[in-house]
Amino acid sequence: MHRTSNGSHATGGNLPDVASHYPVAYEQTLDGTVGFVIDEMTPERATASVEVTDTLRQRWGLVHGGAYCALAEMLATEATVAVVHEKGMMAVGQSNHTSFFRPVKEGHVRAEAVRIHAGSTTWFWDVSLRDDAGRLCAVSSMSIAVRPRRD
């Protein structure tokens, strides 16, 4: 699945496009408002990015810590959904632990999620967040709850 900056979707490889099953349009979500873009997705790894704009900055001009957390959670959740949706399941963030190492003021924040565990009710992802120079700025450990869909 690939989400372009305008929220449209394309399926990559054998992963399903599940956008039509969401009850809220991408443009109306936090992800769409701030411009998260999924760049690549496989069942074991996914990447995404967001352009640094004033919407993402806190009052000191740095990317807000919550933006890193939200990008990591979106990426880990969407990567999980891409696999479990066809099995009648949905995925939502269960826990998000993010540590910060380096501030970002401009450019992009780029995220890479690597799947560590895929259980029947919980998936776990490690997410690295980097600046345009490839420097590690934050890491997130994401637990994703997998539950039956109610659609």
UniProtKB/Swiss-Prot annotation:
Disulphide connectivity of cysteines: none
Enzyme class per UniProt: hydrolase
GO terms of molecular function: 1,4-dihydroxy-2-naphthoyl-CoA thioesterase activity; 4-hydroxybenzoyl-CoA thioesterase activity
UniProt entry tagged with the keyword Secreted: no
Database matches in InterPro entries: HotDog_dom_sf, PAAI_dom, Thioestr_dom
Keywords, sorted A to Z: Hydrolase, Plasmid
Subunit structure, interactors included: Homotetramer.
Family per record: Belongs to the thioesterase PaaI family.
PANTHER family: 1,4-DIHYDROXY-2-NAPHTHOYL-COA THIOESTERASE 1
Name of the protein described by the UniProt record: 4-hydroxybenzoyl-CoA thioesterase
Record gene name: fcbC
